[in-house]
């Protein structure tokens, strides 16, 4: 009988000392309502944006048409904002600080429309895309999809490898583009 009591106590202590490991907390992404591209050619600045203040679903986003001149090279920046807050919160500096976990992808629907080259790099020498150049060719119309990918570390190891296939989409939108 004593053995059963002792066994019960030992079993109770050993079971109460075991607990499941809690999963690592998932980092919530900030809400991004607006993506803004600012093109510069010489002294001319052109600003275009996609605004989706209510997120996926609900109202359709407001999307500017990018209008550029043919046979020009533009430098441009990409910014991400949360304009649902007052004042609006510019999230670009946070993305830049975490550049080893982010990639902006530019996908013109035709190379005859324009070509985009990312010009900024992260600490591992992978492109980021907050700064870029765009080269236009002849007059043309088309689209350009812009995607911000979040490519966080997994198990303390970086996942970003310079490709768009890894990670989750933080923001995505497609601009109409007119070169004329």
Regions found by a protein language model. Give the residues of each.
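First exposed extracellular module after export/assembly in secreted or surface-exposed proteins
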Residues: 26-180
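Positively charged n-region of N-terminal signal peptides that target proteins for export
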Residues: 1-4
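Bacterial Sec-dependent N-terminal signal peptides
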Residues: 8, 12-37
